């Protein structure tokens, strides 16, 4: 299995903001203009919509995957963190790509602020949870792009 360092800094990556009902997905590369939101994947009682995830994976052909690590302010475990780590392990097994975790604290707040700016500029028309999930994934990818050394290996 590839290690975290195996993700080339100039490679295309997919990033994920894992929630209990939706998973925001973004794509990014250091050679491009940062990251952009690309999809929201529904999570059902039996897990994520893997058919939809397979389509996104096939379309973007990433060299690595970046999953948001929902740490608490005091770095304690919580159900959301366990869910994100389980999803990251599934990604690694399914796609045989390097998977890293990056601190996602405040990514949803940052995504909401970006959304508000875009709405004020007339680029967004209404608040949409799906858009925010994917925008939060873009924030996660941008954090990895700006500081890949802060990523951690999947335990």
UniProtKB/Swiss-Prot annotation:
It is found in: Cytoplasm. GO terms for biological process: rRNA 5'-end processing. It holds the Pfam family RuvX. It comes from the Bacteria. Keywords: Cytoplasm, Hydrolase, Nuclease, Ribosome biogenesis. Belongs to the YqgF nuclease family. This is Putative pre-16S rRNA nuclease.
């Amino acid at each position: 299995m590839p290690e975290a360092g195996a993700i080339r800094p100039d490679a295309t990556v997919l990033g994920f903001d894992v929630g209990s009902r939706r998973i925001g997905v973004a794509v990014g590369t250091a050679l491009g203009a940062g990251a952009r939101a690309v999809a929201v994947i529904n999570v059902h009682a039996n897990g994520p919509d893997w058919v939809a995830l397979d389509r996104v994976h096939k379309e973007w052909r990433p060299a690595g995957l970046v999953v948001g690590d929902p740490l608490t302010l005091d770095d304690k475990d919580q159900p959301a963190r366990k869910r994100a780590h389980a999803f990251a392990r599934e990604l690694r097994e399914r796609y045989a790509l390097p998977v890293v975790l990056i601190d996602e604290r405040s990514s949803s707040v940052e995504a909401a602020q970006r959304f508000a700016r875009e709405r004020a500029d007339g680029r967004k028309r209404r608040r949409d949870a799906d858009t925010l999930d994917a925008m939060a994934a873009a924030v996660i990818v941008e954090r990895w792009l700006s500081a890949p050394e802060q990523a951690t290996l999947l335990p």
